[in-house]
Amino acid sequence: MESWLFLAAILIVALLAKNQSLIIATAVVLVLKALPISEKVLPVIQAKGINWGVTVISVAILVPIATGQIGFKELISAFKTPAGFIAVGCGVLVAVLSAKGVGLLAASPEMTVALVFGTIMGVVFLKGIAAGPVIAAGITYTILTIFNLVPIH
């Protein structure tokens, strides 16, 4: 019963904040939880969901390459600017930090509760999004802003 109330509270907060992603995610979890197969489905989503999400984001990121909007010329150009080097460095940093984070979660599963709560708070109240590769872009943006190197398009 507690999990239903917790999810309902998250849904209410998401609705009040008008956060479409969290509304959809919570609604999907509530529907899945109501299904007779939830005991089989939810653990699979818990174990594999982050990887599936990263895959979907990766596909979206690769589409400009597939459509020809980004090619080797743009890749080489990225390495000619401080912003490009910072972006590559942030990508590497996030990958390393993520590996350390996975290790921490394996050693301290109770951290998941704090991370989930913090993520919900950030998504709902600070208009953030729960994503991995996008974090690298956010860190890059922060560093570029500090050094006044934000590319203007």
Curated annotation (Swiss-Prot):
This is UPF0756 membrane protein LCA_1031. GO terms for cellular component: plasma membrane. Pfam families: DUF441. It is a multi-pass membrane protein. Belongs to the UPF0756 family. InterPro entries: UPF0756_TM. Its main location: membrane. It is found in: Cell membrane. Keywords: Cell membrane, Membrane, Transmembrane, Transmembrane helix. The chain crosses the membrane at residues 4-24, 52-72, 85-105, 115-135.
